[in-house]
């Protein structure tokens, strides 16, 4: 164990065998090309699957759409930044000169949180990283009350994000309708003129296609650091 990381290992609840993986997970691209971005990509997928599985098993009567919305709430934005801070990740982030003072930035905290998950997965195995993730998330998941929680649909959430950032609302239009009457496939385009964004999605109804397009745009906004403010 590297002495300066022994406290951090205790907070995480995991001891790295290859501490260089942790170093990379904490290193921002402003510091070096050997940064956390690839680990973030991996950790994002691992986290999404683990949370999807636990929600599927815990909320057996919840429909697919609501499960997706609840998962999105748990694996994006403020939730990740808060978890990263609670695990003291902000104290160990390695930044270049151009990003000094960015340890508390929500987007950086989100990215590092996912990167650390990716690093733990590579350093161990899926069962181990799953156990670690569930330990971190246990207080959040155990406090979920479906009677009081309000999970917004993607279009409502997108509208809220844009309004909170003084941006015009998106416009939806049908590009094509393919297939026979009983098995039609709708292709919908969602546009944000202020952000010059255009996304396309498909669904078996106009409503479903619009929801999917809104979800894609939310993901793009998240990558730009725009999230729903609580």
UniProtKB/Swiss-Prot annotation:
Gene3D superfamilies: 3.30.160.20, Ribonuclease III domain. The gene is rnc. Its EC number is 3.1.26.3. GO terms for cellular component: cytoplasm. Keywords: Cytoplasm, Endonuclease, Hydrolase, Magnesium, Metal-binding, mRNA processing, Nuclease, RNA-binding, rRNA processing, rRNA-binding, tRNA processing. InterPro entries: dsRBD_dom (IPR014720), RNase_III (IPR011907), RNase_III_dom (IPR000999), RNase_III_sf (IPR036389). The active site is at residues 44, 114. One of its GO terms (biological process) is regulation of gene expression. Homodimer. Residues 5-125 form the RNase III domain. Its cofactor is Mg(2+). It is found in: Cytoplasm. The keyword tRNA processing applies. It is an enzyme of class 3 (hydrolase). Belongs to the ribonuclease III family. It catalyses: Endonucleolytic cleavage to 5'-phosphomonoester. Residues 153-223 form the DRBM domain. It comes from the Bacteria. Its main location: cytoplasm. The lineage of its organism: Bacteria, Pseudomonadati, Pseudomonadota, Gammaproteobacteria, Thiotrichales. This is Ribonuclease 3.
């Amino acid at each position: 164990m590297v002495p300066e990381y022994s406290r951090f290992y205790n907070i995480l609840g995991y001891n790295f065998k290859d501490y260089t993986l942790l170093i990379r997970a904490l290193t921002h691209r402003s510091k070096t090309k050997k940064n956390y971005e690839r680990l973030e990509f991996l950790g994002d997928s691992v986290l999404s699957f683990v949370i999807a599985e636990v929600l599927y098993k815990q909320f057996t009567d919840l429909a697919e759409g609501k499960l997706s919305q609840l998962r999105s709430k748990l694996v994006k934005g403020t939730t990740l930044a808060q978890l990263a801070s609670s695990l003291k990740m902000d104290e160990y982030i390695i930044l270049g000169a151009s990003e000094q003072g960015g340890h508390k930035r929500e987007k950086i905290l989100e990215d590092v949180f996912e990167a650390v998950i990716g690093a733990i997965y590579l350093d161990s195995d899926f069962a181990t990283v799953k156990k670690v993730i569930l330990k971190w998330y246990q207080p959040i998941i155990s406090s979920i009350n479906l009677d009081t929680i309000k999970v917004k649909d993607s279009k409502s959430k997108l509208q809220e994000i844009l309004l909170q950032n003084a941006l015009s609302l998106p416009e939806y239009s049908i590009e094509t309708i393919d297939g026979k009457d009983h098995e039609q496939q709708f292709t919908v385009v969602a546009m944000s003129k202020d952000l010059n964004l255009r996304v396309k999605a498909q669904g078996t109804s106009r409503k479903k296609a619009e929801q999917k397009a809104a979800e894609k745009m939310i993901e793009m906004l998240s990558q730009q650091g725009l999230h729903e403010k609580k």
